[in-house]
């Protein structure tokens, strides 16, 4: 599984995370109603405007993100590996996996 980022508090905060087993780190930015994944970018239909390891950022609505994954553990958003190994949402990923 990949721990994406803490989602206990949504605000104008920034955090970094990296996928387990990955030598690349990804930046996760929290806005008032969205999460932006950058640095490594993402792939698949969930993040159509981002590409792996290009630094392109793509935003996803928090409600949609939680609805698609629907699982938090101890305030951490957990995603099973799927597709590119990231978000598990139709092959989409956040960061380099």
Swiss-Prot record:
Induction comment: By exogenous cAMP.
GO terms for biological process, alphabetical: culmination involved in sorocarp development; slug development involved in sorocarp development; sorocarp development
Domain of life per record: Eukaryota
One Pfam family matching this protein: Coiled
InterPro entries named among the record's database cross-references: HssA/B-like_chaperone (IPR050533), HssA/B-related (IPR008455)
Family statement drawn from the similarity comment of this UniProt entry: Belongs to the hssA/B family.
PANTHER family named in the record: HSSA/B-LIKE PROTEIN 1-RELATED-RELATED, HSSA_B-LIKE PROTEIN 1-RELATED
UniProt-recorded name of the protein: HssA/B-like protein 27
Lineage: Eukaryota, Amoebozoa, Evosea, Eumycetozoa, Dictyostelia
């Amino acid at each position: 599984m990949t721990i994406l980022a803490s989602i206990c508090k949504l605000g104008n905060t920034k955090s970094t995370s990296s996928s387990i087993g990955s030598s690349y780190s990804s930046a996760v930015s929290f806005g008032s109603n969205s999460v932006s994944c950058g640095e490594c970018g993402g792939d698949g239909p969930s993040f159509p405007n981002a590409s792996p390891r290009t630094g392109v950022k793509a935003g996803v609505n928090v409600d949609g993100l939680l609805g698609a994954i629907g699982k938090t553990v101890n305030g951490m958003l957990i995603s099973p590996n799927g597709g590119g190994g990231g978000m598990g949402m139709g092959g989409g990923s956040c960061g380099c996996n």
